[in-house]
């Protein structure tokens, strides 16, 4: 008995201990910086009347338990035993308690402190806590861009909306960053905007690779809170119409014995909504999970569109036949996708657009099942809710689908009846399954659909059984609630025979915080109502618990809220649903429910057709997604134990005995899903060949070998160009394999079109399709923010595009937060309109055919009158205004041809007008750019102005009369006078001009090294202006422009960065030591301006250390510049110069090592510098360095503070080589060196002579010398002399010769000007006098250094005028002359060493020759007829379009018969002769023939394949720039195709030039012309258009054509009255020559009748006469002519005048003696002789 009583006493004591009072502490498991922390404190099992008081706060257990927040008091009683507190987390407290210093375990402790814990519960301390994860994230950000996709080179406009945790506007400062497609940060900006809407823009570099860019925003003090938006960058042009491919069923059902129907609809509509009439070409293929595409042969089809629509069906037999060719069967299709491509050709304009369908899956079932919302824990004895979501195989919810559930239970009832229920409209089904008591496991087999159902299995287990029972949460209405609705939840305890707890306690959690807490008295069925407001959207957790016998029992449930509207209101309304016309105004009404800022933007919906489907505009779905990202819960709810339940919903919990472990990460653990990867083994020759190579690199090399070039090369020749040996073998093997396939294909083909078609199908397997479309007006507009108080009506004027605009609106309100409106669509359309296409440019007197297309979408036929409005400078039919009558049937389109001949070199506005009999009509105005004949030529002269030297106070600048100058061409001498003030070179006209110094170099900026010219000179200028505080002397916007230029340069250079921190001239190349060092040096100086990452610069420095050799020198595996010719007493100094260059970069790079964590790497860098200094010192001591190597070595040793003896040796060596003449000191070539390629430059013979312009290498060398002197001696006499020479080497626009010399000269001069800065006033007075058209004219310039303006002046003079200059004042200055004019012919002596040759061939002739060289005579374009690119062609077969689009820049379909666009083949050959070497890269700049554009696909092949022929290419208007690494001694030729976009006749020769990039004075320039006997050289015009074009042409008079009818003395009237000639000669024609767009006739004077300027004219002298090629005048060599006219402005090589023959010239053939002896002509001959005698003797008697 005693034992029994003892056991009963012990049990009672144990039970009483279980029922002891407890303090429960609840909190979100994550603490966010600056965001109030919601805390729940509950008093459990307290005695009646008990009161507990205390505080809650946060502390850092890793930092002496320092408090991280203020204390928050609480009071608990037995009646009010659950309180909800808000605990502030200020940034200042978090910082002071050391939270920011936590790195490995960012944990913080939530503590409840109360004496009750110690006094009543007898704990050792008065505290109880739980550990939380600390995160610095807070708030919400939404980033919006003005477009979803951009072209490289376009400007991106974006907005950032900043909101706090409550979705209200935040005014805290933001950090906005931009990442490029390779994940590199290219822009960082810290901003603060009181409106909470930050707006900015930036320019995407034009050399950017295609890919996805990202704009991210975060609070400056909470860097973990990061929200971003993505946008796509790709080369595109907007489509004119959109093609859609819509399958009848979004999936294809396939099983072992079944294949579902394959039916697809093709629809084509213009962007403004109207259907397209034309033809569709459709083809099919298979896609595996990796996206590998394999076409299904034989399924291609051609369809005619009716009302813009067509339909395609594939039968099982057709598909099986195509699969057999791939050795596949129908069951093999599961897991693959059916690729469908459609190309639609519009009938009226022949334009082509395409679409692809890549999401058409072969599936075993029509549906998919998602059971993720179903709990994984059951409550025995309570209903279990199965929540399933059924989707169609293509993704959307599937309504009204039967769902069958088979249930297997453990325990006494193993199986329950099958349950069947149909899905609701959202594709959801909710089934309550009654679970008997005692069930421990539930197995569910769920199937959706009756035929070929989707099946899913789920096993659910009960939590471990206990004496405290289970808590069941049941939803009577399981559907998702909406905002403003109430959710009812029933609570029930299960498994308790006798429940003793009085209350259920519950919490509602949403977005990572406890929204509310409460309790409900326990009943048989306890109901809790939760009102759903905006704070609970888009989902919330309901958590309930009770304590029984001291044990917590809990359960939870996630409730998804149906996504609806925003908390506030924003509605966009347009005035009606009517269509608008371009240029109309529209009224846009903005409706809100409170005062708000509304951000607007309108985007062309055509962009959605161009961009990826993943880049969508901001909408409320994205807003809810961001809001839900703060939700800390994982899964649908429930758990094995109370702590697990709390942890699963994102709660931290402690009751003193139990607690939840600290959360590890912010995100939920991801479920691992088994993914079956399926690939298709296609037994095709090409696939087999590719399959022979395992590595991706070898496969790429093989793919390149399979690709055919746009020029003739054998496989062996191609393989020899592949640099990597590992790539060379697969490349050669695959190239030879492809050639054998082509030969085999030719042998098996019957010939003609079929043969070409087969080749096309084989070739298209070798590369991905390039889809390019044509441009059509603006892409976005209406980018503005305005304040709206409930209603605002905005009148907007619509752009000229005919398209559908989508207007987006986002509002931000202080009371309602952010709201994204449903976009408003606005269609801009004209039922009748016309479309005009113009070439990029055309030359004067070329003939242009315009073909405006008239579109009629009315229901009636139209007769339209179409004309081109008269405009000066254009020859038009009837002088302009002469109309053509065109019949345009309803619903059709018609082209109308017009012929135009430009006669003036200018930009003219060409207006095409179409009028109908009713109010129907349209007009389009576009600018036609007309250029002069020949090529532009520029030359510069630089004079030093020194009023302190009496010899230099007056000087004369001679005029220029180049014999090569084009007659009637504009020619001028521009004169710029500057004082000796740095602001001229560095200011708003120099390095800080809108385009920077780089824009003045007249050089391209395509490679990595060239890109630095956007950055380095601007940094030098900014550094000078910051140091001398002179920004105020420049225009106010100059500082902003400098920041913009620096940001652009930084973004651009990041495109060349590799993952290891190194840089390459091209991303496809190996990294360059020299370029990497150059970037490190510049970016180290630009850290503050660009916001670059120091860690990235440290990576760059680390890479450079790996390039150092054992002796301390550096080597370059892929040099950008070859400096082995730069001079030196013996041999090459390249290694020395490179080592010094890297040392300089590393020294500057030490600025990036401020962080203590990088100290070890910093010491390695310093050790590397010391080692390199030792190497450089040894080379300097040997005394064998050339000037360039000596200068850079001296500067490097001085900069790094090397041992003084090494510095002295280097200094002395350098000064020995200096050349000093007058006040100038510089370093050029060393005359004793054998490796110099430039002869010494002499100083001017006298102070009034122009300064000779030195080559780029001399300027760079002298710049290093100046930097060395400034570091060693400061501003002294030597530095003054060097700087004086350097300043006078700058070009007219402020730059120097090339990139390196410009960068270094600007760097050196800015350092000099900082050292020599003075506030002393300087004056320079200059008087310039010259003879002008209206007599002698003088200009007086007074330049004062204290004036903001007036630092420089620019004047224009006639090219031939002599300019007298007088100088006064107390300051030196510079006078620069820029002469510019157009030339007939390229005469350049450098062509003796450097050569370029350009030939243009008709594409058919080229194809024949190419095929002959390939030993095959086919090509898919072989069916072209004749050699003339303008000749009629045979009809185009459908599949040729798919290959053809790769070769066309524009998406223009081939036309039939006379409408076929001509295509030509360009061949560009370069080589060098003699021993001349280049410093490195050479650039060929080819100006295309008028109307042509290069085929980008051809140019891409030259640069992107393994056998690379060109490093890079650029297209700029009519120019194609090709970058070559070097110029060989033998001819190196590359080829590409070009397509004529607009018909042009009488095409004039165009120019081409090749030059050494680093020494541009080494160049060769040539003209080239169109193919002989080509239509390009024929006349297009007719009638009065031709007469107008020839209006300026001379008329040739036949011998004695008027006979005796000379009573009016018409010869004498022409000579003396109108036009009154200035010369008269009787000449004999010696020869005829072609000069650019002119013909030159060399003649011998027989008799001088009259002269004005030509005082030296005499018998037997020669004179040249020029006439335009477009004129029909023809003078026969050997015959004599009487020629009279006006004096010319040009001279020949001997200085004698040459004359232009035009409409004011008299040309009469002299009669032969035989003709004059005839009786009929004897008198007429006498009259002619009398005129010659009288005019030569007496002249004009008036």
UniProtKB/Swiss-Prot annotation:
Compartments it resides in: Secreted
Modified residues (Sulfotyrosine): 1414, 1418, 1420
PROSITE patterns recorded: ALPHA_2_MACROGLOBULIN, ANAPHYLATOXIN_1, ANAPHYLATOXIN_2, NTR
Propeptide: 675-678, 1445-1451
Cross-link (Isoglutamyl cysteine thioester (Cys-Gln)): 1007-1010
Disulfides per UniProt: 68-97, 634-668, 701-727, 702-734, 715-735, 1469-1533, 1581-1586, 1593-1671, 1616-1740, 1716-1725
Annotated site residues (Cleavage) in this chain: 755-756
Domain of life: Eukaryota
Matching SMART domains: A2M, A2M_N_2, A2M_recep, ANATO, Thiol-ester_cl
InterPro entries, sorted: A-macroglobulin_rcpt-bd, A-macroglobulin_rcpt-bd_sf, A2M/Complement_sys, A2M_N_BRD, Alpha-macroglob_thiol-ester_cl, Alpha-macroglobulin_TED, Anaphylatoxin/fibulin, Anaphylatoxin_comp_syst
Domain Anaphylatoxin-like as annotated: residue spans: 701-735
Oligomeric and partner information: In absence of complement activation, circulates in blood as a disulfide-linked trimer of an alpha, beta and gamma chain.
Role: Precursor of non-enzymatic components of the classical, lectin and GZMK complement pathways, which consist in a cascade of proteins that leads to phagocytosis and breakdown of pathogens and signaling that strengthens the adaptive immune system.
Name of this protein: Complement C4
Source organism of the structure: Cavia porcellus (Guinea pig)
Organism lineage string: Eukaryota, Metazoa, Chordata, Craniata, Vertebrata
